């Protein structure tokens, strides 16, 4: 969870100071409105999937962080056999795998740990409405040298054998991903809502 916004934290400190000196908050600090407070206090993080239906999870977005609700949907889908997954469910898993692995170790880690999604990830990102992230990811795949006929094992081996030069070329794409040019969690949640009939937990 992100820390409180600096300005709000300072305002709280000034309020406490005013209370200790017998003054009012208005004497020492600008007024902090309810809207300002709501903007800097984040929703809590939903702690994993707990057997809810998809409708129940989607209703939780009013209370919990969007990314945590999407993670819970992923957690439920990971319990299903691969053969039982619908096309929209595969999109959810592909995008979540990308976000998890790239954030933990860059695109190389995604190629190494989740090779089964390499061929479909660009299309999946475009399908949920994240074209900039799709472009960045396709550029990263070009550095890997991905070929249409490569198997999962070949993708993992290619990732493990990347040269220092290739790794250096990946860095700008890692950084571009970290900048989040598209709101991935919000777009993925909207995709889940739009395809709820084909997403079964």
Where are these predicted regions, by residue range?
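Bacterial N-terminal signal peptides that target proteins for export
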Residues: 1-8
